[in-house]
């Protein structure tokens, strides 16, 4: 008697039918389209995207530690030190010993860095605004924010 072997493929649902796949490609494509436009505009302002991220994160604050800065920016820890060195060499940030913890340093914008923040941040917001408002209503933006935060949370807890 011969036992007919069932193929493994026939026992499983087709992976191409997974519902999340209909979202995956558009999500990634939207992200890359955003990066291309945003990065190009930031570079036209005379900054690299990591430099812009650090300046905008420090803007309107009293400064923060390196650890806080690395947690609040999208800049990797390995890149952050070099970015800060270059911004400090340009006179845009300063490093001040912390009063609370002598082992810690506070990074803050210099007056020149604050002036730059006040110039470039509104320009970037003004540049990006039509892309979002031309595609989504305010309610859709709120819904999208909620969904993206849920998705991020799902990836971070697993």
Regions found by a protein language model. Give the residues of each.
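Base-recognition residues in the alpha-helical recognition helix of bacterial helix-turn-helix
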Residues: 25, 53-57, 81-83
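Charged, amphipathic alpha-helical coiled-coil/dimerization segments
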Residues: 6-9, 35, 85-143
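N-terminal leader segment of winged-helix/HTH proteins
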Residues: 1-45, 142, 150
